[in-house]
């Protein structure tokens, strides 16, 4: 996994993101990469993915993917979860539903595959 204590990434997370890109960047098929990356949006690792894929968190200006209150304390906004798509995916809608059923909000994507 891409778990990293400080959420800023390190050499290991960069290599993991490079590996993800190696699997998808030359792929001519519709591609969606989704996950709890545990990395801040400005991290080098996320920036690597941004160069080759469309980051929907960034495109839709999402500020948080997690509840801001944990154990009664305000922990502030945090983006840890991402959806990346390639140019074979048409996004009809994307939202982060602020529903506290988990320690992460659900990411909801409505899309079509482009022929």
Predicted regions and their residues:
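Active-site regions of metal-assisted phosphoester/phosphodiester hydrolases
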Residues: 1-115
């Amino acid at each position: 996994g891409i778990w990293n204590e400080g959420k800023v990434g390190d050499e290991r997370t960069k290599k993991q993101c490079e590996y993800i890109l190696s699997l998808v960047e030359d792929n001519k098929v519709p591609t969606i990469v989704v996950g709890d990356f545990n990395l801040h949006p400005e991290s080098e690792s996320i920036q690597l993915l941004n160069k080759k894929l469309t980051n929907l968190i960034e495109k839709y200006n999402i500020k948080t993917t997690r509840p801001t209150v944990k154990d009664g304390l305000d922990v502030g906004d945090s983006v840890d979860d991402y959806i990346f798509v390639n140019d074979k995916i048409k996004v009809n809608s994307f939202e982060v539903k602020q529903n506290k059923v988990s320690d992460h909000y659900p990411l909801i994507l409505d899309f079509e595959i482009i022929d």
